[in-house]
């Protein structure tokens, strides 16, 4: 047969395959291997209904052979082969899938499934090859044929000399171009990596001749290069093995082989689902966070396989952001893929899988918290901020899902506690869940604001992460108990203490007004403190914006500046208050000096910046002389 032209629509589609459909050139090998696997599967299915055929799996394989000198890459399979008519129909018409036709005409059982469905994967070879030759002999034909094409200019089919049933595809690899290195597809190591990445779990052996340096026989120090045929792929995926056969070491080895992390996983979840959509999954909860986890460079997602063939490195849609630390894979036979096999046509299937994965991860974390507290605390130390972010993000729509996974350090227990544990230990007269914010536990313990709450014997939660208070503001309450900062204006104290405090404010109203005039817009109010015992002064905040929030938001790089409504609280029982009263009306300069010093002192205690450090140090010097 002379050269024949592709149909006009086929020429356009071929151009799309070469230039547009696939995002990475290396997937051509995945497509050719998947086609080869399909060809062997077809013999298996044929043997189920044809008594004259036997199927011994040991006789079936795929072999990849690069030749750098001739710039060829050969893919051989011992599958069903193609007749002349099938060559014409399957390779002469682009997007005509022989595998799809075979599946339509044969009932597929026994857990096998043929991969191909669109009929374009073969043409991905033209992304890396100037010319492609296919020599094939069908199980249903005594003659062999060669299909040959250089791409869009057409193809030819001629008789060929081939004795064994199966197909040999030879790619004539392109010469290197300025921005494209095609030599890599002739490199044995690179080809091995591509096979392991995309086709590691193809059910038939993928073989290559591999050159290794070995000690010469009888020699102690002389080596020689030895060529050995090796099977590159794993073939049987761990997720299709019975869970009872697998040990923790098996899961750990898989975790490390797939390079999900360099540590050991803290926990694994093995999922097998046979329902409206069938899938298998192995999920891992890492022991530690990757170095870039809390940066924009980190990419979440699970490996997504279709019939054991990798189609996505990181499928982000399978995980909610708050579980982005989860590593692992999902394999399904029921995914509706697009023409490139790199994206899904419908997201309903993915949403069903993602919903179940979220549920399974939550169950595993709850189990870890309940039964392995030490390991859960190790997990929370690494990924707790992400759980808190999940409470805060999306306007708190996931807060009920995550609130029982939160841990905070307790002032009384001197360890991490859950919100449920905190509430269960609250005295009957305690109205609120109290918390204090700061850079560290040590710093929080020294805060003047904690004195009154601690003296009453109430437990205080320590918030040391920047996200903590934002998450709690979104949570609002737990078990109908509101959260209350120890720096807030109302701590829920007894009425008699309120009356005493109001009396102190009335008695010193003139002094507090004078202090407020000195500080001008720096504070909303100056008042007597009901919380201080030994410290002279403290800053608190009225309203929703706390002092800690002001500090965090103002430190962000977007130049967004906010200001909390600050209240300067004075301990009227402290000696310095008497000095302040003595200066009022008698020495205006000293009164102004003391007022500014107390305000700046309160700023320092809160970790807030002083507007004029030079003036502050000069004021200290004035007091000292």
UniProtKB/Swiss-Prot annotation:
PROSITE patterns: HSP90 (PS00298)
One GO MF term attached to the UniProt entry: ATP binding
Location(s) in or outside the cell: Cytoplasm
Keywords recorded for this protein, A-Z: ATP-binding, Chaperone, Cytoplasm, Nucleotide-binding, Stress response
Region ranges (A): 1-341
GO cellular component, one term: cytoplasm
Annotated region (B), positions in chain: 342-551
InterPro entries: HATPase_C_sf (IPR036890), Heat_shock_protein_90_CS (IPR019805), HSP90_C (IPR037196), Hsp90_fam (IPR001404), Hsp90_N (IPR020575), Ribosomal_Su5_D2-typ_SF (IPR020568)
Region annotated C, chain positions: 552-625
Coiled-coil stretches noted in the UniProt entry, renumbered to this chain: none
Location (main, coarse): cytoplasm
NCBIfam families xrefs: PRK05218.1
Subunit structure as annotated in this protein's UniProt entry: Homodimer.
Family: Belongs to the heat shock protein 90 family.
Role noted for this protein: Molecular chaperone. Has ATPase activity.
Protein name as catalogued: Chaperone protein HtpG
Organism: Oceanobacillus iheyensis (strain DSM 14371 / CIP 107618 / JCM 11309 / KCTC 3954 / HTE831)
Taxonomic lineage of the native organism: Bacteria, Bacillati, Bacillota, Bacilli, Bacillales
């Amino acid at each position: 047969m002379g050269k024949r032209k592709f149909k006009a629509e086929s020429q356009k589609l071929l151009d799309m395959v070469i230039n547009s459909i696939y995002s990475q050139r290396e997937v051509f090998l995945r497509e050719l291997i998947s086609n080869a696997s399909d060809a062997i599967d077809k013999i298996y299915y044929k043997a189920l209904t044809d008594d004259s055929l036997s199927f011994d799996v040991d006789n079936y394989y795929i072999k990849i052979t690069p030749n750098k000198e001739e710039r060829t890459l050969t893919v051989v399979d011992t599958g069903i082969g193609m007749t002349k008519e099938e060559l014409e129909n399957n390779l002469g018409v682009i997007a005509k899938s022989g595998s799809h036709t075979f599946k339509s005409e044969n009932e597929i059982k026994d857990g096998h499934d043929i991969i191909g469905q669109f009929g374009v994967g073969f043409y991905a070879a033209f992304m890396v090859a100037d010319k492609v030759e296919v020599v094939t002999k069908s199980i249903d034909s005594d003659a062999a044929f060669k299909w040959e094409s250089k791409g869009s200019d057409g193809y030819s089919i001629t008789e060929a000399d081939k004795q064994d049933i199966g197909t040999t595809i030879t790619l004539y690899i392109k010469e290197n171009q300025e921005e494209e290195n095609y030599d890599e597809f002739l490199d044995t190591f690179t080809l091995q990596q591509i096979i392991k990445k995309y086709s590691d779990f193809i059910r038939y052996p993928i073989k290559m001749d591999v050159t290794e340096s070995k000690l010469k026989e009888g020699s102690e120090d002389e080596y020689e290069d030895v060529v050995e045929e090796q099977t590159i792929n794993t073939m049987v995926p761990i997720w299709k093995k019975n869970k009872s056969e697998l040990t923790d070491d098996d899961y750990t080895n898989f975790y490390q082989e797939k390079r999900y992390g360099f540590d050991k996983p803290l926990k694994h979840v093995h999922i097998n689902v046979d329902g409206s959509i069938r899938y298998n999954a192995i999920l891992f909860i890492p022991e530690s966070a990757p170095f870039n986890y809390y940066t924009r460079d980190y990419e979440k997602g699970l490996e997504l396989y279709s019939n054991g063939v990798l189609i996505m490195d990181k499928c982000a849609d399978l995980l909610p952001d708050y579980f982005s630390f989860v590593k692992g894979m999902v394999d399904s036979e029921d995914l509706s893929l697009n023409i490139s096999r790199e994206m899904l046509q419908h997201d309903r299937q993915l949403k069903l899988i993602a919903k179940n994965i979220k549920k399974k991860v939550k169950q595993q974390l709850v189990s870890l918290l309940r039964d392995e507290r030490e390991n859960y605390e190790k997990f929370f130390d690494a990924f707790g901020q992400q759980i808190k972010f999940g409470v805060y993000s999306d306007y708190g729509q996931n807060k009920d899902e995550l609130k029982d996974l939160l841990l905070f350090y307790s002032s009384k227990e001197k360890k991490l506690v859950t919100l449920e544990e905190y509430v269960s230990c609250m005295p009957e007269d305690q109205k609120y869940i109290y918390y204090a914010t700061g850079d560290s536990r040590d710093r929080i313990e020294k805060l003047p604001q904690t004195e009154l709450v601690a003296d009453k014997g109430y437990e205080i939660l320590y918030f040391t992460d920047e996200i903590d208070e934002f998450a709690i503001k979104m949570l609002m309450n737990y078990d109908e108990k509101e959260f209350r900062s120890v720096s807030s204006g109302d701590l829920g104290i007894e009425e008699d203490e309120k009356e005493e405090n109001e009396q102190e404010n009335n008695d010193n109203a003139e002094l507090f007004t004078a202090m407020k005039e000195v500080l001008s817009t720096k504070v909303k109010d100056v008042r007597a403190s009901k919380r201080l015992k030994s410290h002279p002064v403290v800053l608190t905040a009225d309203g929703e914006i706390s002092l800690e929030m002001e500090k965090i938001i103002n430190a962000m790089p977007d130049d967004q500046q906010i200001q909390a409504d600050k209240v300067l609280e004075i301990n009227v029982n402290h000696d310095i208050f008497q000095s302040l009263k003595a200066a009022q009306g008698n020495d205006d300069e000293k009164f102004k000096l003391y007022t500014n010093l107390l305000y700046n002192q309160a700023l320092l205690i809160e970790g807030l910046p002083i507007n004029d450090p030079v003036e502050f140090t000069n004021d200290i010097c004035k007091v000292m002389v």
